[in-house]
Amino acid sequence: MQDTILEYGGQRSKIPKLWEKFSKKRSPYLDRAKHFAKLTLPYLMNNKGDNETSQNGWQGVGAQATNHLANKLAQVLFPAQRSFFRVDLTAKGEKVLDDRGLKKTQLATIFARVETTAMKALEQRQFRPAIVEVFKHLIVAGNCLLYKPSKGAMSAVPMHHYVVNRDTNGDLMDVILLQEKALRTFDPATRMAIEVGMKGKKCKEDDNVKLYTHAQYAGEGFWKINQSADDIPVGKESRIKSEKLPFIPLTWKRSYGEDWGRPLAEDYSGDLFVIQFLSEAMARGAALMADIKYLIRPGSQTDVDHFVNSGTGEVITGVAEDIHIVQLGKYADLTPISAVLEVYTRRIGVIFMMETMTRRDAERVTAVEIQRDALEIEQNMGGVYSLFAMTMQTPIAMWGLQEAGDSFTSELVDPVIVTGIEALGRMAELDKLANFAQYMSLPQTWPEPAQRAIRWGDYMDWVRGQISAELPFLKSEEEMQQEMAQQAQAQQEAMLNEGVAKAVPGVIQQEMKEG
């Protein structure tokens, strides 16, 4: 890494102007993200010092769905108690091994230890809480920046605290992170430069200064990093490789030519709005029905004040017909609203992988139904899994390997993701195996003449073709014939040996008689 010391000589940094330029392109995406946050988790898009309430209106379905899906994705892509990746070598890494006379199979144990060390390093950086928060932002806002400082825990940076710039193909060109730091956190030389840049303005140690960190792509896999306090250059200019970049800008999905991503909530904001609207109607209707009013007949003989102030079980003088309780009778009107609300809630449950919301309402729900529904919901996220394997899991794995040792670079090692889309593929293969077993046992229910008419080899091949199942553990026709031939030969040898064994005593007795 090459460092260049930046000294303040009256020059102003251009980073704040770049921030303003890129912020204009971010504005429409940020406005939409704040709208979606009101339907789900409002606190995600609150600025520091905002007095806005964090209550999400009249419903909690959006918050429940977002929290559930965020935790679900974190558990699937980054499962506890085991590594989400395994270490593999690139072509260059294998060549280095060959030059040293080593074999790849000899390093399996070493790679396992490296994976464990990398996972421990990530755990010490508290990456799991940050990952859950990242998924919440991606679901609601569509964008989030995963930041790894030089020391301490990783953090999920909301989209209103950073800006990005991409080319038409979506490749990242610029990232600017905005942080507010107290003046006393800077070293004395930097603090003096900041005060000089402010034209002698006396600053207190607790005054906050806007610290911009700008990462600019320099080509050939390298990035330049500069910092400025307001518009005053501070620190050093660094040149680092891509895998050492402390930023991972993430998106849920992104259209061609756009710098910013779009969230899952955008696709289903209509459903969330209807849930909000109907929940408000239900709550207001229930409040009206809970409001008790009494009608007093004009000229009644009942003492109204005594009636109002009397306790439970107290004797009151009066006529029952003088006082009447007003009932709105709106319960029947709320019933269809509740039914429609349940339909929309189930639709949100399907998208946000909430199995309990999508399961049919019945006394007996079979295990097959539960497994089928869970698999369908997982498959709906297949595209998201494959995207995050490249944009999130692989860079985080490289971070862990970098923490384990500087020699683990992208030129030599290639982390292979073993969760998410890979695990989903293995689950589908097991499902095919279960279907194969089911169809193979099906002919046993047929009449005996039909069973005798089956060519079992052809039937097995036909079933495998229908369910597109590759079962490498099944023996081929040639292997079956070879085994049958070996068994027949073994039987012949056994019979021959048995015959010889029986004949030997007779031969011996005959020789003894002749002798």
Curated annotation (Swiss-Prot):
GO terms for biological process: symbiont genome ejection through host cell envelope, short tail mechanism. Keywords: Capsid protein, Viral capsid assembly, Viral genome ejection through host cell envelope, Viral genome packaging, Viral penetration into host cytoplasm, Viral release from host cell, Viral short tail ejection system, Virion, Virus entry into host cell. Signal peptide: none annotated. It is found in: Virion. GO terms for cellular component: viral capsid. Its main location: virion. It comes from the Viruses. Belongs to the podoviridae head-to-tail connector protein family. Forms the portal vertex of the capsid. This portal plays critical roles in head assembly, genome packaging, neck/tail attachment, and genome ejection. The portal protein multimerizes as a single ring-shaped homododecamer arranged around a central channel. Homododecamer. This is Portal protein.
